[in-house]
Amino acid sequence: VEGLTPFDIYQIAEGRREGNPQAAREAFRQLGEVAGEAMVSALNIVDGVAVLGGGLAGAGKYILPGVVAALKGTAGTFGGNSFPLLQMDVFNWEDEADREKFIALGMGTVKVPCSEKEVPYLNRRSICVGLSKNGASTSIMYGAYAYALRQLDK
């Protein structure tokens, strides 16, 4: 259908606009899968959390399952073996059971070499993927505020 915006597709998925809700949800799931495949590449070189933000985060309940599926995906070899695309456990922060599993991992501490300082350490490679609920402006403000506080501590 021509001229539909992501918001229109969301409205269809929610049953608030005429159209095929199942097709709209599937479109968002596929979007999530493609986004997740791109995130796999980034997360293999960056150690951090994955947060989906922007206008599409409002449709996160339809997008996130595809993202999580892609992040938990595997690749196969010609010999029939498979291995995970990410060398870490993936948790969906928006799913209560997954969130509890992630929190239950617990954190230890490790001593920084040549220092008396200890820092938090998770001895198991793990990542949570979640949705931004603040919007870009508020998230940037929080980041700037945290940065300013760190600068004051120097």
Which role fits each region the language model picked out?
Residues V1-K154:
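ATP-binding/phosphotransfer module of carbohydrate and carboxylate kinases, centering on a glycine-rich
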